[in-house]
């Protein structure tokens, strides 16, 4: 009867209203539907909501405690229940928890992507081996540096030049200081011996080709400085790797290294993609604006490209990993974690001292973040290339690489957690400033 009387109204046609079960300050929804052309329904809603602090439950938004009739295109009426009797509808609960889940995934996208890559490599190594066959690792590395070129602002290059003292320290730390940690690693007695030898070689490597830059970008550090240190250390590292491996790993015995091949590979996978990305940015200003307005999207694409590396490496090493005793492998993993934490502590203290001498401005903080991340990581692809070219001079190639795969994954995960902590601390600080 109520609906019929409402439909009969000439002043307010198709006004559908159901009051809450009991009087009070509840949400009321008015929906007016007009049919000016006889074919298409046009709806307008007017909503009066109860204050959120009076709604039972812990949901930070208001709910409708009424239902409404909505006409369909075929002339039928559909009733939608939006809650009632002061309760919260199941759809609203699902919406809230869905938003919370999406927010968590967005805030922790990189570690989730890395864990997913490792899990996929263990669950189905066939896909990872197929991706390795078609050089997806090189493709993902090229993709990361193309994105780095796309997001590289010209003014950031000037900031990188201004941060040359920290950048120079980063190069010295990567190429001259941190390789000496391999001497301590070689003192560890662990069988098979290749596990320790592999970590020693890993310690002599330059910084990661992609993850340091990607993490610097996520942390809001000086990505241009991170790029400069990454490219320079990997190109110069071709000259320093033979010396350190011969001195600390081979006991002074000379070993042959594929210097020319490594140099060409790094030029193709690092420098050329970076230049291509920068040229595209400078050539198409509209696309540059699109990149600047969607930096979070490109950061997620960076994270996906980065997760391909552990996925492929775990897929390749799965059978070998299962053949090693868990106790021995966990010990090697622990050594890798301890190595990365030691590098972080050493570089953090050194950077703090150097930053105190050069000044503690905001730009100095961004430079410190970049140098700390890139100077504390070691690259896996270059290590794999070096070991493969040595032809088994230090033992089984798979066993040499296996602990380094774990160390590579652990350093990325540790640093991604560290970056997330920095981001949350920055959000809390900005919130307190706004509140004050």
Curated annotation (Swiss-Prot):
Disulfide-linked positions:
none
Q: Where is the transit peptide?
A: 1-47
Name-wise, this protein is: Probable sodium/metabolite cotransporter BASS4, chloroplastic
- Family of this protein: Belongs to the bile acid:sodium symporter (BASS) (TC 2.A.28) family.
Transmembrane stretches, by residue range?
109-129, 131-151, 157-177, 195-215, 225-245, 257-277, 297-314, 328-348, 403-423
Is Transferase among this UniProt entry's keywords?
Answer: no
What compartments host this protein?
Membrane; Plastid, Chloroplast envelope
Tell me which UniProt keywords the record has, alphabetically: Chloroplast, Membrane, Plastid, Transit peptide, Transmembrane, Transmembrane helix, Transport
Keyword Phosphoprotein listed? The answer is: no
Q: Name one GO cellular component term.
A: membrane
Membrane-related topology note: Multi-pass membrane protein
Its lineage opens with: Eukaryota, Viridiplantae, Streptophyta, Embryophyta, Tracheophyta
The record describes the protein's role as: May function as sodium-coupled metabolite transporter across the chloroplast envelope.
